[in-house]
A protein has these predicted regions:
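Residue-level recognition of single "structural anchor" positions
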Residues: 1-367
């Protein structure tokens, strides 16, 4: 039990959402409960997480969700553990909501160095229709920046994806590489605009950052085979794009490509049973696919070491495995799936009236 990781769950308490200040202590190790010294309320370790108030043993739930995150079909889990299919679906939905909250709290906090971002879409067959899953990847850290599920492959889908990319970090020096879909450059030149402050009265004009670069790799097919690849620079100069590619990919001969996000798509197809081609484990609703996407994506970011991110120690020559979240400086160690499912994410701080307590004023001044 780690009190420094917890915060008070009482929304009426002035210490709600504040962690690492010493006001949360262990109340009961047997029941795994904490207590806030400010409001004297106690709360269980799993409050507000995916494992809160589940009647099944916690270890069994984590094992089931681990199998789902590694691509095991729900029907196989039902047959192996003797569970009801609706129970497994409910656990997956709760895990997906928890992973989305963790992603919004840590990845979309605006602290990621993007450098180069690649985006692409997956066509997913579901029962009675088709869905599109759009994803974005930060190339230097291999960090998954989020995904969006939609019934149509249109500008609204791409706009929602690029808004998630913008929330992850600054776009002042960003290279966006995509395929030939026309919605990408059109929406990027809108989403990445920022107010240009001049000090004059009135609404400021929206302008694009000078360091924003947009490039496309357009593939031409003939007889269902790749015939040629046309590389087009939509915004910026060819020299600036080549320099950004060399910096973010570590190769002077790098060209405009979407290879990194396509490799991520292959990972998603392997780790999400509904994404497998010609599968019998198709989903019926978009919400089910979205829950699985967040579970697999968060596990990819925080739990699964990436081979290209490992580093060799200088003193003994050992390889140190790292996750994309470690490469992006969002955490200092690989998480277990239990850590991911029980990570406490504070909600929005409620508006309060009245005088603030003395300890809060002292903490504000100390910060």
């Amino acid at each position: 039990m780690d009190p420094q990781r917890q915060f008070c769950r009482n929304r009426a308490c002035w210490a709600y959402g504040r962690r690492g200040e010493g006001h949360v202590v262990i109340h009961s190790r047997g029941e795994r409960r904490y207590q806030c010294k400010r409001c004297r309320r106690t709360f269980v370790e799993t409050a507000g997480t995916a494992l809160y108030r589940l009647r099944t043993a916690r270890d069994e739930v984590v094992v089931v969700l681990t199998l789902l995150a590694y691509g095991c079909p729900v029907q196989a889990v039902v047959a192996a553990f003797g569970l009801d299919e609706r129970t497994v679906a409910r656990w997956q939905a709760r895990a997906g909501s928890q992973c989305q909250r963790v992603h919004d709290h840590l990845v979309q906090a605006g602290q990621v160095e993007l450098g180069q971002v690649q985006a692409d879409e997956l066509r997913v067959r579901i029962v009675g229709g088709v869905l599109w899953l759009a994803s974005a990847l930060a190339v230097p850290s291999r960090l998954w920046l989020g995904g969006v599920v939609s019934a149509t492959r249109d500008g609204a889908l791409i706009r929602a994806l690029l808004e998630r990319v913008r929330a992850c970090g600054p776009v002042r020096a960003l290279l966006l590489c995509t395929d030939g879909l026309a919605s990408y450059p059109a929406q990027a030149l809108r989403v990445f605009r920022a107010p240009e402050r001049t000090g004059r009265r009135g609404r400021p004009r929206l302008a694009l950052p000078d360091g924003l670069l947009v490039a496309q790799a357009i593939k031409r097919y003939a007889r269902r085979r790749l015939a040629a690849v046309e590389r087009r620079v939509v915004r910026g100069t060819d020299a600036a794009v080549v320099a950004a590619l060399a910096t973010t990919q570590g190769a002077a001969t790098a060209v405009v490509n979407t290879a990194y996000v396509e490799r991520l798509n292959a990972t998603f197809r392997a780790r999400l049973a509904p994404l497998a081609r010609r599968t019998r484990a198709g989903v019926h609703r978009a919400a089910t696919l979205e829950a699985g996407m967040w579970l697999a994506g968060a596990a990819y970011n925080f739990c699964w070491p990436h081979r290209s991110l490992r580093r060799r120690e200088r003193h003994d020559g050992r390889w140190i495995e790292r996750t994309p979240a470690q490469a992006a400086s969002l955490t200092d160690h690989p998480w277990s799936l239990h850590d991911l499912l029980t990570y406490p994410v504070p909600g929005a701080t409620p508006k309060r009236r009245g005088r603030r307590p003395r300890w809060l004023l002292d903490a504000t001044h100390a910060a």
